[in-house]
Every structure is written in structure tokens, then in C-alpha cells.
């Protein structure tokens, strides 16, 4: 299959991002496979890298991290910049607004997804930075 802006994998990834960015954690959870891996990185030194293996740490650990993150995200602030994918791979680029208490900031994200044969997210790689 060729790379498309609205491929099957893009639709799954987009639905998961739309869910968590609107604080719908139940819908976000449904999209994640039981053997998923998550890697989060940024070049900003004050934010630690995150690596989670759901089959080792459990979906509850993944969801606890996601819930902690989305508490600061402003619902409805998702702005998609680009999306490409095929049947199993998706690449999304977007921003969300977040408020960490001192001021609202913009989180610029690029997320790479790999889906399993059941169309669930089995690998997610997040690269982001915070901008005021």
C-alpha cells in the first residue's frame, strides 16, 4: 500500500491522539495493544526520557503515565500539522496546548506508530519540545 494522509494506521493513531487530547482515557486505552512499547524523548534537558514496555510494566503503568501527562493538556487544543501512513505505520505531527501552572505552553509533537494485526498500537515513539 502506498503512503496516504488518511491511511488505516493514520486513522487509528489520530483517533487515539484525539481521545487523550480531549481527556477520554478509556477511548485512548482501547487503541493500545497488550504488548505495546512507548518511547518518549525531547532535547530539553529538564524533561526526562520515558521508555515503557506494556507487556512488562502493564497497561496500567502506560495509562498512569498518559493520565498524568494529559492533566495539563487543554481539551480541544489539538492542531494537526501533518499525517502520513499505510496499513500498519503512521506518522503524526501536531501541537497541543498545555498548562503546567505557571503559563500555557505549546507542545509540538511528532509521533510514529506501528500497529499490530488487530489494528492496535504496538509501538509508539514520541519526539516533542515545549514552546511558550
Model-derived regions: residue spans:
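A beta-strand edge to alpha-helix "cap/lid" segment located at domain peripheries
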Residues: 3-4, 8, 64-132
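Short, low-complexity N-terminal intrinsically disordered segments enriched in polar/charged residues
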Residues: 1-35
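Hydrophobic pocket/interface hotspot
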Residues: 16, 28, 36, 59-62, ...
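A solvent-exposed, acidic/Ser-Thr-rich amphipathic alpha-helical stretch
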Residues: 6, 30-87
